[in-house]
């Protein structure tokens, strides 16, 4: 199993180091793992003048899976748009044809008090958001900023093809089948033709999955319902921009964005795995970051790309044990628990494993 390791920027190298510790522990037991590291984002720009250097893309293409830290930092904000770290991330997703983004939001019982919602609203939360990743307004053409009638105008194009919607629908229905057999499709079909097509195709694909109960919700209502009664959801499927916003909102239900992993898959289940949080430049290099989302991303890698459910469960259970023992990085620390550093948390997971 060949893994391309892309630490990226900010806290990326620190959290990736902890995930690599877990992989090394599995390797010491006999797992056939090969890891190679390459720069991406700001680190890619610093090394090669490109947020996605050719050598990094080649490594990612040849690997079975990609493990990514985080990209971005204020020192890159003045670069031309195509050279900014985030563009490297968008490009690698596009180049590897990673069209389905899976973002779980679950709450560990011990962290119920860390959520910004009342414990009774969120305890037992376990939902999955499936976000389409390569279409929509982020990639639609034409786009740009130009002068019209003497003033500047910014424009983007929201666009989905039937095949793009159909393939992410099949992924979402497949995941719903393995979970609670409930799928909620989120769009804005009352005002957007793009969403109208989305909804039509979801209804068509649903015929292939008679066991799954399909419902539909407008995105504004979905945002409200996620806060009002999040446990009504099991699996959500939505487009790129709506998924970007809703999954970040859902992340705070879990107590910390530092707890949540994600997977981005192609049609053969090759994937890129990363925590959903950003590069947190304010705490970079201070050994304060929470590595659990990155470690849980490794569990997702085993679940979806390597189809090794036993190892995925082992990693997830090791994280549960560490949380149950009261170890906490600063973002999830509460009175009466033990505050640990990023590297100490990584060590604790390896011991539990």
From Swiss-Prot:
Q: Is Glycosyltransferase one of the keywords UniProt gives this record? A: no
Q: Which UniProt keywords apply?
A: Amino-acid biosynthesis, Branched-chain amino acid biosynthesis, Cytoplasm, Leucine biosynthesis, Magnesium, Manganese, Metal-binding, NAD, Oxidoreductase
The cofactor named in the record is: Mg(2+); Mn(2+)
Q: What is its main location?
A: cytoplasm
Give me the residues that bind substrate, please. Answer: 93, 103, 131, 220
Matching HAMAP family: LeuB_type1
Q: Which PANTHER family match?
A: 3-ISOPROPYLMALATE DEHYDROGENASE
- What name is this protein filed under? 3-isopropylmalate dehydrogenase
């Amino acid at each position: 199993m060949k893994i391309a390791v892309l630490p990226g920027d900010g806290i990326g190298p620190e959290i990736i180091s902890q995930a690599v510790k877990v992989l090394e522990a599995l390797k010491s037991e006999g797992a056939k793992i090969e890891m190679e590291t390459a720069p991406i984002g700001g680190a890619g720009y610093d090394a090669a003048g490109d947020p996605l250097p050719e050598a990094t893309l080649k490594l990612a293409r040849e690997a079975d899976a990609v493990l990514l830290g985080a990209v971005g930092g204020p020192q890159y904000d003045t670069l031309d748009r195509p050279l900014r770290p985030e563009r490297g991330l968008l490009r690698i997703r596009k180049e590897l044809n990673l069209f389905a983004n899976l973002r779980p939001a679950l709450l560990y019982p011990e962290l119920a008090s860390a959520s910004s919602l009342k414990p009774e609203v969120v305890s037992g939360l376990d939902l999955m958001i499936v976000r389409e990743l390569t279409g929509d307004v982020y990639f639609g053409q034409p786009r740009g900023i130009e002068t019209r009638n003497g003033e500047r105008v910014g424009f983007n194009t929201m666009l989905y093809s039937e095949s793009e919607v159909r393939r992410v629908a099949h992924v979402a229905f497949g995941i719903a089948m393995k979970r609670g057999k409930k799928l909620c499709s989120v769009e804005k079909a009352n005002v957007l033709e793009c969403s109208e097509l989305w909804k039509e195709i979801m209804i068509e694909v649903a015929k292939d999955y008679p066991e799954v109960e399909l419902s539909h919700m407008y995105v504004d209502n979905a945002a409200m319902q996620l806060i009002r009664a999040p446990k009504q959801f099991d699996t959500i499927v939505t487009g790129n921009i709506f998924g970007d916003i809703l999954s970040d909102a859902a992340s705070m239900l879990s107590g910390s964005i530092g707890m949540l992993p994600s997977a981005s898959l192609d049609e053969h289940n090759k994937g890129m795995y990363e925590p959903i949080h950003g590069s947190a430049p304010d705490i970079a290099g201070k050994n304060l970051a929470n590595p659990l989302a990155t470690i849980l991303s490794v569990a997702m890698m085993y679940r979806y790309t390597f189809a090794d459910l036993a190892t995925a469960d082992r990693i997830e259970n090791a994280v549960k044990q560490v949380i149950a023992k009261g170890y906490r990085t600063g973002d999830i620390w509460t009175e009466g628990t033990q505050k640990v550093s990023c590297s100490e948390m990584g060590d604790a997971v390896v011991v539990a494993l």
